[in-house]
A protein has these predicted regions:
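Metal-dependent nuclease catalytic cores that hydrolyze phosphodiester bonds in DNA/RNA
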Residues: 1-193
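Metal-dependent nuclease catalytic regions and adjoining charged, substrate-binding loops involved
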Residues: 95-103, 228-233, 238-344
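Secondary-structure boundary elements
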Residues: 169-175, 200-208, 244-257
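Non-catalytic protein-protein interaction segments used by genome-maintenance enzymes to assemble
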Residues: 174-176, 181-233
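Short catalytic/ligand-binding loop motif for oxyanion handling, primarily in non-cytosolic enzymes
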Residues: 65-66, 75-76, 219-220, 271-273
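Short regulatory "switch" loops immediately downstream of catalytic or recognition motifs
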Residues: 157-166, 201-203, 241-250, 283-284
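Hydrophobic/aromatic-lined pockets within catalytic cores
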Residues: 57-62, 187, 200, 215-218, ...
Length: 344
């Protein structure tokens, strides 16, 4: 089972050119421009919180990276904080002094109050010099608030003890749990990668189960909407087929089966009951080849078609229009397939 873990660093895994679920989903959601743009979300509070919950539940050995923010001075607003964090990055990367010109350049980059005078922008940042120094002094840690830590602890405890989720963490004899499993495989002719939050292997019943952990700002009963919005179905289908390929190629596990894919969701505000969204395995093929939601007559593109389009855009270096537009040579027709009357 150890060989399921890639013999590479986390950075190497991130930098590989294999397609990830997030890149494929971003393309389907935002179009080809998403293939050449990368949003820096590393400093966003919801990203930090999600990572904290992941580490508490799945990788407690990483908790040394976190430190409670005990700064007692006046805290900057979120917009000024973004500028200050960028200033810290500049100092750490260059080792240079933070001049007024650098502050103005960062303010411009961050679209920080464009109508403010230059002197006002500089003063707004310099006002929090003590806070900037505090961040620099703790540069080796991910600073979090006491509230964030406490909520994360409660979420982890709920997941570990609630009846619907406990079974994936309080394992029985003959079961094994593997956290943060990184895989790179081929899928339908393309190289793909996936970071599996948790795999539970039952050697008695000869099964695998994939569990993915999600956190977010929406309430528990709204997660199903997030499932469609953020294309989590792509993740379920891709990861299922990736694991299927790996175990099919391993003599030790060739007679094991993969159970339904499971998402566990907890809102960042905490909840008494975890949201468990199960993707029945017989739906994976539909997600691959195209599918309808409910009684809608609109057919969504499947994973195979989406990856095919992504590969086309990379190969042809076209990112401003869709491959469908190029294949049609820019020509469209409104016919009976798009518009129907009552008697048609």
């Amino acid at each position: 089972m150890d060989r399921f873990r890639l013999s590479c660093t986390e950075e190497q895994f991130r930098e590989t050119k294999a397609l990830s679920y997030s890149r494929i989903a971003s393309y389907d959601k935002d179009g080809p421009i998403a293939l050449i743009t990368k949003k820096d979300l590393s400093g966003k509070s919801y990203i930090i919180f999600g990572k904290l919950v992941d580490d508490m539940l799945l990788s407690p050995q990483n908790l040394y990276k976190y430190k409670i923010n005990n700064y007692n001075g006046e805290l900057p607003s979120s917009s000024i904080s973004d500028v200050i964090n960028e200033c810290v990055e500049f100092i750490l990367k260059t080792g240079e002094e933070l001049t007024d010109n650098v502050i103005l350049e960062i303010c411009e980059k961050k679209d920080f109050y464009k109508r403010w005078k230059k002197e006002t922008k500089i003063e707004a940042v310099r006002k929090y010099q003590d806070y900037l120094d505090f961040i620099l002094e703790n540069k080796d840690y991910q600073l979090i608030t006491p509230f964030m830590w406490n909520v994360a602890e409660k979420i982890v405890e709920t997941i570990k003890t609630y009846p619907t989720t406990k079974k994936w963490f309080d394992l029985l004899e003959g079961q094994e749990g593997f956290n943060q499993v990184d895989l790179i495989t081929e899928y339908n002719g393309s190289l793909v990668k996936g970071a599996f939050d948790r795999l539970v292997v039952d050697h008695v019943n000869k099964t695998f189960q994939i569990i993915d952990l999600k956190t977010g700002s929406v309430q528990s009963d709204e997660f199903i909407d997030q499932f469609w919005k953020f294309r989590y179905w792509i993740q379920a289908a891709l990861y299922y087929r990736m694991l299927e390929k790996v175990i099919d190629e391993d003599e030790q596990y060739k007679d094991y089966e993969i159970l339904d894919f499971v998402f566990i969701y907890m809102p960042s505000s905490g909840a008494k009951i975890p949201t468990v969204l199960t993707i029945e395995r017989d739906r994976i093929e539909a997600f691959e080849n195209g599918f309808y939601i409910g009684k809608s007559e609109f057919k969504h593109k499947g994973l195979k078609q989406i990856i095919k389009e992504v590969e086309w855009h990379y190969e042809n270096q076209v990112f401003d229009v869709s491959c469908d537009f190029m294949n049609r040579d820019g020509s469209y027709v409104i016919d009976c397939n798009q518009v129907r009357s009552d008697d048609e």
